[in-house]
Amino acid sequence: NIERKLEIKMHFPVGVLVDKKGKKLEELLAPYQENTMGNCPKEFLEFMEATEEINEYEDHKEDYETLDEFMEDYYGIEKDKETGKYGYWENPNAQWDWYQIGGRWSNMLLSKNGYKSNYLQLKDIDWNGMYEISKKQAIETWDSNENGIYRMLNGIKKDDTKESYIERMSKFETYAVITPDGKWHSKDKMGLFSVSTNEDDNRNKSFYDIFIKDADQELILVIVDCHI
């Protein structure tokens, strides 16, 4: 709809946990595809009637003799052949309209053998090594950006101390996570991942504690660059 088109477009990293015996990467991402290109699988779509646009015809009857003429000329909307109504087929659970493995977050993962990759089995990821690298980068960033706009561009908040900034930037996490059961997990307004009905369960837990620590270490973590 109109509001959807006006939303700010952005890229964000998603961690997809893939079970080699379960759904493939494409199958895990499919339920969250936006229908902007008209190629989203039909099973995930719902028809959204253009109610507001139809009601607006009342204010334009002097210029358009029929509703059909108004909808097609003013909005460029034709009647849907399947429903016989004016509207759009949309995915109510849409989270992305384009994706690429790695992308802007290429080689985000570090293996215990020392090489970087876009995907690794959990058992092969060097979590401590990634923490130390991120910590070093955070210290260098803080020390080289004492003042000015570059603080904001590097994720330094107004009320940050050096310690709080380093702690936050050293933690590995992605914007969202898709678990092998196909569920999409993203942070709520409290900054917590929505994997529990009790927000206190996750208040002090890290990405690692929530998604990695107790997971099957044979799972493959794939870093995906998504756009919406």
At which residue positions do the language-model features occur?
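C-terminal or internal capping secondary-structure element at the end of a domain, subdomain, or sheet
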Residues: E218-I228
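Acidic (Asp/Glu-rich) sequence patches and key acidic residues
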Residues: R4-S206, D214, I228
